[in-house]
Amino acid sequence: MKNWKVLITICVLGCTRICAQETGANDTVSRHPLTHGVGIDFRPVYLIPTNEFFAGENAAWQPLRKSVSAHLKYSFRFHPDSRYGKLYPHTYQGIGVSYHSFFDKAEIGTPVAVYAFQGARITRLSSRLSLDYEWNFGASFGWKKYHPGTNAYNYVVGSKINAYINLGFLLNWQLAAGWQLTTGIDLSHFSNGNTQYPNAGVNTVGGRIGLVHLSLIHI
């Protein structure tokens, strides 16, 4: 009980900090509108076989090699003429929610993650193209955990709630005014930090593609 409360608290604190940044920006740069964004991501990835469960030692006796997830994200960034916009150019932050399928609902589940994220430009490649990074951190819910009687093969997940950590590197195309297309690669890790056993964890590596719509809103 205490373990999942800790994970939720960490996620809430991260989201609260992002909201506090937006509120503080509103107080200090009220003459400059924030840029708000709504985006969707689709991420097909490879399940790294770090445990025999993924190699085929499961109820179906079939290797598990793939996973997909869909993400809905809200972000904001500071106006380039504002104080924070000058300090942190090309930086964005926000909150996201994602749905994950590992194609084994009976043994692993189909978890939903809620997370804070932040990204920024690494380098500009052309007038419309840049190389960016983005990290996600939050909590994932809805896992099917190990049980010696009903889920005995699943040594990778020991709790119903697990931390979600992700790092990605993206090519960001400016398609048109207010529209961005992103493609790239990322790494993800799910675990409970050994607060419950077994906890081999779930690790993935793969691709991602996303579309973001940006708009200026005076608040």
Regions found by a protein language model. Name each.
Residues H32-V38, L87-Q93, S127-Y133, A177-L181, ...:
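Outer-envelope beta-barrel architecture signal
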Residues G56-A60, F102-K105, N151-V157, N192-N199:
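Extracellular loop and loop/strand-boundary signature of outer-membrane beta-barrel proteins
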Residues H218-I219:
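Conserved small/polar residues in nucleotide/adenosyl-binding loops
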Residues L34, L64-A70, I108-V114, L129, ...:
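Residues that define the transmembrane beta-barrel architecture of outer-membrane proteins
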Residues V38-F42, L72, Q93-I95, Y133-F137, ...:
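Membrane-embedded beta-strand positions of outer-membrane beta-barrel proteins
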Residues H79-D81, T123-R128, Q174-G178:
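Outer-membrane beta-barrel channels and translocator barrels
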Residues Q21-R77:
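Short glycine/proline- and aromatic-enriched beta-strand/turn motifs that initiate or cap beta-hairpins
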Residues F42-I48, F76-F78, V97-F103, F137-K145, ...:
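Transmembrane beta-strands of outer-membrane beta-barrel pores
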